[in-house]
Amino acid sequence: MREQLLAVERVQAIEWRDGALYLLDQRLLPHRQTWLRFDHAAEVADAIRDMVVRGAPAIGIAAAYGLVLGARARLQAGGDWREALEADFARLEQSRPTAVNLFWALQRMRERLARLKDDGEVLGQLEAEAVGIHASDREANLTMAQLGMELIRKHQGNPQVVLTHCNAGALATGGFGTALGVIRAAHLEGLLEHVYVDETRPWLQGARLTAWELAGDGVPVSLNVDAAAAHLMKTKGITWVIVGADRITANGDVANKIGTYQLAVNAMHHGMRFMVVAPSSTIDMSLESGDDILLEERSGSELLEVAGQPVAADVPAVNPVFDVTPADLVDYIVTEKGVIERPDSTKLAQLMCRKRLH
């Protein structure tokens, strides 16, 4: 399966070359593929905040490279560069509050930095750490794709019909995707009949990104409005809902793109399986439950325009970006360390003690 996935690799969102970070501007997809160059930590933080790059693993990778850029500038400026670098840590941490991969990646960079005493080694070592985070996520994607595909094979009768939400693909990660990695692997193994993709308002990550990724790979895919999901579950033979995650707490609660919670409720009602695919860096054992997660809300202005024209201009809009799916609605959590069925705090703790499978 690894070789099959590598053979069809087509999309990347992040590149590090010649000492600079390049990000595919996801706000412009699918109409334009524009790469932007970043040379400063503040620019990377703004790119994360403004959704040039999005998806929990990709945000973490971008932040790690952003810290390298910050360290380079601080070293060149001289003086107490370590203290000055704290401003870059803070700005990157504040860019998006919900995706724990951001904080995990920056903590890895901080720990590597703390071990370095020779200023001459700092840039090379921090760059190696960031490149390692990027490469590790790609390997995790491959492992999760295999594990998730095997779950689908285990339950397969006829080819399966899948519903997915938002974008948990190559554009959201350093590799092939989390949820879409599983979907890609299942397609390559002939286990999929069709994939339905929620459009995922208001940024339309499903319509602009996921449908584009899957169609480009030859996966049979249809786009639907978010509100049609329950109807499709009832009428289209859907057997799996497969999503990614931005944060998973110690008890197995899952924070993901707004609309995920209602998919899980409807999946349970209709008797279909609900799979969450995320690297172990998404699991936050410091938070007991989803009630402890800081859930990002974005400006209501994102909901008050259609094609650049104002609608309901005098009405306030509520725009939560994430919701929390309780663990008891989740059938499987798939990570690079293994699979948890019916997650709870004991199973999550045991998983986090394991070494990676790849």
Swiss-Prot record:
Keywords: Amino-acid biosynthesis, Isomerase, Methionine biosynthesis. The keyword Isomerase applies. Pathway: Amino-acid biosynthesis; L-methionine biosynthesis via salvage pathway; L-methionine from S-methyl-5-thio-alpha-D-ribose 1-phosphate: step 1/6. Its EC number is 5.3.1.23. It is an enzyme of class 5 (isomerase). It comes from the Bacteria. The record marks 166 as: Transition state stabilizer. It catalyses: 5-(methylsulfanyl)-alpha-D-ribose 1-phosphate = 5-(methylsulfanyl)-D-ribulose 1-phosphate. GO terms for molecular function: S-methyl-5-thioribose-1-phosphate isomerase activity. The active site is at 246 (proton donor). The keyword GTP-binding does not apply. Substrate binds at residues 54-56, 96, 205, 256-257. GO terms for biological process: L-methionine salvage from methylthioadenosine. Belongs to the eIF-2B alpha/beta/delta subunits family. MtnA subfamily. PANTHER family: METHYLTHIORIBOSE-1-PHOSPHATE ISOMERASE. Catalyzes the interconversion of methylthioribose-1-phosphate (MTR-1-P) into methylthioribulose-1-phosphate (MTRu-1-P). This is Methylthioribose-1-phosphate isomerase. It comes from Ectopseudomonas mendocina (strain ymp) (Pseudomonas mendocina).
